[in-house]
């Protein structure tokens, strides 16, 4: 089929759409990892920067003790850091991902360093330090085995692509392999650090306002941020709330930092001349705080007395004790209070002045928010939106693993400390601790986190998930997933985090979120062109060197004029103020265009708040836009002739494309289409307004009137890029009802197709469609997602008709059985069985692969062992049926006597009603030297009644009837549909996109071309109609059809044409279940639950019971709930109604309650009822049973 597309152009479409798609081709097609680049870059930074920062950035103290006049400290230093390629245990042969999967081992590499142990002896009196090396530096000391991300910079597939073996060349990577399983670390939302945000909390009948900042140095990759909170209480007093102090007035703390007088404090907080309302409120707050005007020394004394700490100051001398407390206070104020605020001078006192100004800045935000909420003053700011993407950061793989590495590295140092203390006898000859470093501490911690998904805190659970290989799109979508962490059930009930927020435009797909209560809106998927930044600490010196001399530092700024300047922030650190902000902003932006600064640096100039923020931190959502200058698009189609890649385009035309993060996005004027810019220019070129009469004709109440002129700054490359990976493949999604797009997102992940090209070398649990086809009608984005290589569906001839009115009611389908016999929608299911030889630690005996011998093996199952070979497994192409043993394993009995059977059976049994065949057997040996047998069994899945299908418009249905082709509808040309769907599915669901797909697909099939169904591109239906008429078809795709059962012509024309349908994994063969007899539970004696355990079918206590009673089938009800369930025969005392017990060695029963032996009745009850009476008795509730003999006798 030709690869040219049908060009349906709108007469209003005056811009070159093809040039914009050619630009998108540059972005996606040259780099197969572009969709997982954020994970790859983050992991590379974890290896190259985060681990060295942890190992070399701390003190690495393993032991410290104080004597009378000196402090003796032992520490480690790490140099020559490096990581080796992943290898097998022999450290000679390279390990590749496919080998790790086969051998059930982790794909990891050894991280090594040159380690030196030091002894520091500090003289307390003279403060001099004497340092010496203990032993000698040891090279290539293993620190840990680090899991390696597949296709990252340190993966063997990247290091040695020439011998990559049979790995799929289309695989994008971005996942880990832990114990043979593929694991993906999901991206996690978190609140923005180093930015004060104002929120409210409910306190009885009032709202309390507070401003909070999560403070962590920008250069620090991992670590827990220090929370700094300023609260306004109900009495309008403003207090400081941090873990180190008791409740204390914020103004006392400001004085302790160095701003002493009330006048200086007020000037630092607000502009006295312009903000009268704020000044009145501030005076009320200062009076309510009951803080007298004290000096800095007095304020420090107050703060020292307010320290809330477990640290004890045991010195008996009050002066020494006070000095110790002051030193500890100084340490808190220097290291733990707003650690991200620094002057850059290295002077702690100047740093404190900066912190005082920053706190005043926080108070200013708090007061403005309070005035907006309490008095509804419009010019003041409202509270911050905690759901806005502006106030969020995304934690990627590198940062998450870095946090775990730091946690387990500290544990490793603690283990070294314990060993050192036990071995250190004399400080003159201390032991060398380097040989006792345990790399397993970090290795096991990282492996366990990736295996379980638990990354430490309560809100960091489920971050690592098994990579689902259902189809290619499903696997790839894991890499684009972002989750909102929820701590407990109370946060799960909140609705606001689930809503689609306007700041998610362009960054999160509006359609891709799971259905159902638990995860709807909390699990999101990134849009196609969205990226996430990583930390760029190398950019900080460049920015700081440029700003030297261009801003006024805070210590030299005039406090009374402080608010007349624009504040300049770098990663949340207030560097200073300036009047010349336009030049600074333009210069930095020009440096960003020229490449002197990274394109990912954020430059946010907020005119309303007079603040200029520069960001180099990681976790910011960012995407490229076309730039617009003077309402003219800078991008020209001829530029594409000079470049071959995206990076080359950025280098050759640096000012055409700009990367914009979410906060900077708030200050741009974005044109969704280039036509918007042309319309604005058209309005601008109109004759200006010269009279009041012309002014009155303008609708001034409508800001979006056609006469309003807009000056744009940026333009979308194409608006279809706001959709996600899966929804980009929906044809014409802008013509469908919105929920249908969400449904299709969930259906597409369940569709059968071809999930990876090397599936023959793997043993995944998945499905393979025999004849997957590229859709006739698809969006341009489909080639960026790989669906043209790994399709998941077939082009089907679909008729919309009720036909007989019986076979396809509701969402059921009539399907052409003859097409199925020819291979239509046939698939194979792949099932995996695996057994590993295990060692019994108690007896040191190992299990054995063999065909169990009934004379030697005990506990043989009720299964067929005849399919096994002598090696212990069924050979390739052996037909397997339900109950056949596929892998034979026996465990030796450690305590068996010579006359007993020596082995116990532990074989794997095939359980499925659908027969299969052994497709592949893989025999390997794991790292421990034990054999592994992996078996892949395939079973053919022919479409059957009840199997589920879905179109790409979310029109899902199940097969209701399989009709022979002779009974199907047919047209005069002999066209017979593959599927007939009910017309009632269209009016309510309004999936017009599917109708357009069918109409355009008909034209494409006739002309032998592919159709363009890209969203947000105009479709000229009249042009399609004309083309169909020219080809000899009815203009709207309707055809005269004949009844296949009687040959009569149908009185109405039928809409028929090609529509792409997906076969989903929900099939009757996997769900059909019935049971006559089988195993029961030990406690309740009822059938277990579930098809896999041969369980029973539950008759509910309400619905089914009431329905059976209403039908009058009481005997049937009794039979199913008692006779065929947990029937139990017992004896009951007629006198007291309690259970009677049989007298030992006698033939009669007695009641232990009333000693009755004559009036005993035998009854039949459900065993569950007997359990209920016993459980009630355990809480002192005695249940009594009245039998037929005593039912008429009233009880006292």
Swiss-Prot record:
Q: Which GO terms describe its biological process?
A: DNA-templated transcription
Q: Which Pfam families match?
A: RNA_pol_Rpb2_1, RNA_pol_Rpb2_2, RNA_pol_Rpb2_3, RNA_pol_Rpb2_4, RNA_pol_Rpb2_5, RNA_pol_Rpb2_6, RNA_pol_Rpb2_7
Compartmental location? Virion
Instruction: Give the EC number(s) listed in the UniProt record.
Output: 2.7.7.6
Its predominant location is virion
Q: What does this protein do?
A: DNA-dependent RNA polymerase catalyzes the transcription of DNA into RNA using the four ribonucleoside triphosphates as substrates.
Annotated family = Belongs to the RNA polymerase beta chain family.
What name goes with this protein? DNA-directed RNA polymerase subunit 2
Its source organism is: Acanthamoeba polyphaga mimivirus (APMV)
Q: Which gene encodes it?
A: RPO2
């Amino acid at each position: 089929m030709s690869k040219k597309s049908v060009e349906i152009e709108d007469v209003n479409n005056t811009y070159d759409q093809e040039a914009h798609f050619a630009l998108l081709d540059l972005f996606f097609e040259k780099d197969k990892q572009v969709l997982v680049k954020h994970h790859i870059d983050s992991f590379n930074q974890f290896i190259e920067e985060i681990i060295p920062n942890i190992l070399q950035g701390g003190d690495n103290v393993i032991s410290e003790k104080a004597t009378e006049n000196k402090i003796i400290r032992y520490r480690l230093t790490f140099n020559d850091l490096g990581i080796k390629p992943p290898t097998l245990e022999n450290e000679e042969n390279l390990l590749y991902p496919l080998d790790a999967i086969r051998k059930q081992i982790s794909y990891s590499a050894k991280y090594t360093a040159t380690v030196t142990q030091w002894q520091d002896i500090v003289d307390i009196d003279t403060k001099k330090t004497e340092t010496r090396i203990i032993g000698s530096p040891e090279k290539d000391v293993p620190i840990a085995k680090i899991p390696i991300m597949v296709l990252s910079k340190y993966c063997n597939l990247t290091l040695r692509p020439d011998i990559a073996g049979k790995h799929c060349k289309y695989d994008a990577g971005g996942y880990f392999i832990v114990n043979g399983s593929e694991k993906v670390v999901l991206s996690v939302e978190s609140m923005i650090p180093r930015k004060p945000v104002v929120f409210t909390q409910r306190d009885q009948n009032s709202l309390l306002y507070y401003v909070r900042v999560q403070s962590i140095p920008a250069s620090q990759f991992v670590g827990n941020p220090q929370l700094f909170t300023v609260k306004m209480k109900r009495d309008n007093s403003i207090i400081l709330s941090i873990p180190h102090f008791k409740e204390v007035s914020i103004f006392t703390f400001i004085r302790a930092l160095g701003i002493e007088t009330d006048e200086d404090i007020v000037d630092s907080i607000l502009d006295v001349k312009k903000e009268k309302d704020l000044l009145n409120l501030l005076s009320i707050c200062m009076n309510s705080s009951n803080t007298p005007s004290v000096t800095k020394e007095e304020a420090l004394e107050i703060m020292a007395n307010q320290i809330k700490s477990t640290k004890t100051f045991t010195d008996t001398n009050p002066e020494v004790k006070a000095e110790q407390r002051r030193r500890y206070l100084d340490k808190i104020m220097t290291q733990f209070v707003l650690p991200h605020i620094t002057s850059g001078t290295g002077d702690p006192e100047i740093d404190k002045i900066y912190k005082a100004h920053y706190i005043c800045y926080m108070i200013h935000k708090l007061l403005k928010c309070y005035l907006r909420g309490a008095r509804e003053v419009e010019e003041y700011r409202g509270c911050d939106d905690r759901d806005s993407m502006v106030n969020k950061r995304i934690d990627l793989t590198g940062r998450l693993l870095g946090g775990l590495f730091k946690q387990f590295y500290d544990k490793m140092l603690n283990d070294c400390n314990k060993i050192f203390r036990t071995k250190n006898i004399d400080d003159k000859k201390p032991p060398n601790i380097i040989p006792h470093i345990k790399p397993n501490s970090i290795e096991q911690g990282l492996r366990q986190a990736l295996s379980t998904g638990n990354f430490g805190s309560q809100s960091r659970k489920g971050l690592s998930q098994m990579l689902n290989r259902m189809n290619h799109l499903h696997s790839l979508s894991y890499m684009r997933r972002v989750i909102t962490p929820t701590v407990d059930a109370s946060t799960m009930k909140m609705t606001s985090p689930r809503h689609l927020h306007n700041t998610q435009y362009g960054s999160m797909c509006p359609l891709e979120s799971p259905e159902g209560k638990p995860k709807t809106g909390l699990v999101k998927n990134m849009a196609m062109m969205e990226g996430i930044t990583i930390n760029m600490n190398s950019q900080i010196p460049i920015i700081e060197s440029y700003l030297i001399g261009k801003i006024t530092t805070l210590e030299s700024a005039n406090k009374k004029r402080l608010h007349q300047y624009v504040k300049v922030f770098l990663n949340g650190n207030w560097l200073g103020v300036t009047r010349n902000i336009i030049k600074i902003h333009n210069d930095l932006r020009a440096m960003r265009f020229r490449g002197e600064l990274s394109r990912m640096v954020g430059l946010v100039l907020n005119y309303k708040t007079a603040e200029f923020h520069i960001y180099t931190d990681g976790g910011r959502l960012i995407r490229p836009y076309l730039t617009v200058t003077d309402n003219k698009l800078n991008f020209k189609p001829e530029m594409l002739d000079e470049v071959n890649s995206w990076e080359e385009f950025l280098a050759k035309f640096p000012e055409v494309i700009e990367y914009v993060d979410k906060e900077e996005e708030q200050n741009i004027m974005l044109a969704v289409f280039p036509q918007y810019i042309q319309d604005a220019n058209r309005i601008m070129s109109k004759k200006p307004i010269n009279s009041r009469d012309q002014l009155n004709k303008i609708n001034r109440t409508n800001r979006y009137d056609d006469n309003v002129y807009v000056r744009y700054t940026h333009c979308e490359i194409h608006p279809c890029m706001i959709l996600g990976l899966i929804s980009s493949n929906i044809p014409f999604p802008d013509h469908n009802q919105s929920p249908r797009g969400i449904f299709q997102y969930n259906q597409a992940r369940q569709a059968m197709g071809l999930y990876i090209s090397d599936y023959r070398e793997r043993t995944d649990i998945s499905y393979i469609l025999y004849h997957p086809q590229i859709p006739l009608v698809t969006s341009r984005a489909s080639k960026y997602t790989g669906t043209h290589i790994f399709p998941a569906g077939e082009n089907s001839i679909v008729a919309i008709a009720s036909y007989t009115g019986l076979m396809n009611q509701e969402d059921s389908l009539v399907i052409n059985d003859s097409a199925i016999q020819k291979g239509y929608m046939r698939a194979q299911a792949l099932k995996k069985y695996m057994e590993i030889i295990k060692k019994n630690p108690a007896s040191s005996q190992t299990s054995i692969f063999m065909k169990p011998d009934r004379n030697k093996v005990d506990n043989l199952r009720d299964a067929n062992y005849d399919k096994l070979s002598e090696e212990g497994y069924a050979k390739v192409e052996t037909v397997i049926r339900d109950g056949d043993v596929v892998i034979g394993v026996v465990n030796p009995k450690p305590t068996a006597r010579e006359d007993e059977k020596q082995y116990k059976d532990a074989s794997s049994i095939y359980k499925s009603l659908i027969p299969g065949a052994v497709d592949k057997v893989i025999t390997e040996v794991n790292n421990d030297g034990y054999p592994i047998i992996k078996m892949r069994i395939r079973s053919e899945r022919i479409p059957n009644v009840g199997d589920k299908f879905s179109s790409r418009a979310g029109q899902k249905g199940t097969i209701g009837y399989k009709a022979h082709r002779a009974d199907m509808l047919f047209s005069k040309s002999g066209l017979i549909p593959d599927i007939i769907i009910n017309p009632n599915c269209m009016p309510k669901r309004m999936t017009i996109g599917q109708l357009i797909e069918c109409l355009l697909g008909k034209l494409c099939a006739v002309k032998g071309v592919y159709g363009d169904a890209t969203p947000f591109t105009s479709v000229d239906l009249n042009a399609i109609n004309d083309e169909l008429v020219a080809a000899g078809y009815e203009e709207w795709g309707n055809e005269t059809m004949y009844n296949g059962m009687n040959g009569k012509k149908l009185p109405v024309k039928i809409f028929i044409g090609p529509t792409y349908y997906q076969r989903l994994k929900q099939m009757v063969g996997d769900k059909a279940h019935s049971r006559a007899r089988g195993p029961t539970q030990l406690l309740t004696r009822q059938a277990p639950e579930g098809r896999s355990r041969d369980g029973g079918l539950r008759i509910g206590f309400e619905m089914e019971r009431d329905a059976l009673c209403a039908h009058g089938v009481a005997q049937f009800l009794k039979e199913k709930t008692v006779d065929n369930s947990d029937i139990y025969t017992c004896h009951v005392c007629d006198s007291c109604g309690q259970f009677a017990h049989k007298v030992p060695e006698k033939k009669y029963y007695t009641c232990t309650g009333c000693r009755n032996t004559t009036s005993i009745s035998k009854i039949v009850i459900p065993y569950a009822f007997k359990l209920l009476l016993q459980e009630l008795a355990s809480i002192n509730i005695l249940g009594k049973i009245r039998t037929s003999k005593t039912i008429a006798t009233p009880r006292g």
